[in-house]
Regions:
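Beta1/beta-strand and adjacent pyrophosphate-binding region of the FAD-binding site
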Residues: 1-14, 30
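Glycine-rich FAD pyrophosphate-binding loop
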Residues: 23-43
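Active-site-adjacent segment of FAD-dependent monooxygenases/related oxidoreductases
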Residues: 43, 48-118
Length: 119
């Protein structure tokens, strides 16, 4: 039986990110995922500049950027259309070297993370 340094259960965005970070640092990684393919609809839709730094470390930003949108803000409305929270986001690069807010399609991210693991 082969031994692994790390076992990760689930290959969603968190599991895929962790697997890439461990592999990048020389750990052998066993990934357990019950689904044959990723779920085709989005669930997570937002991340910030700190997460983009992690993706930069992994090495997926060049390919993944074309699937992201710089988020200018979010308005939350109630059932009558009244704005209950307006959350504008600055559109300038932060000290982390990235914009403070991005929108994305989760299946695109999962595809990029899995592609990187195959290399």
């Amino acid at each position: 039986m082969k031994e692994y340094d790390v076992t990760i259960v689930g290959l969603g965005p968190t599991g895929g990110t962790l697997a890439n970070l461990f592999a990048l640092n020389g750990f052998s990684v066993l990934i357990l995922e019950r689904e044959k393919s990723f779920y085709p609809l989005p669930r997570a839709v937002h991340f910030d500049d700190e997460v983009m730094r992690v993706f930069q470390t992994i090495g997926i930003t060049n390919d993944f950027l074309k699937y992201t949108i710089i988020n200018k803000g979010t308005k939350f409305v109630n059932s009558k259309g009244k704005v209950i929270l307006d959350w504008p986001r600055p559109r300038k690069v932060t000290e982390n070297g990235w914009y403070p807010s991005y929108r994305f399609n989760q299946p695109d991210l999962e595809r990029q993370l899995r592609k990187k693991l195959m290399k």
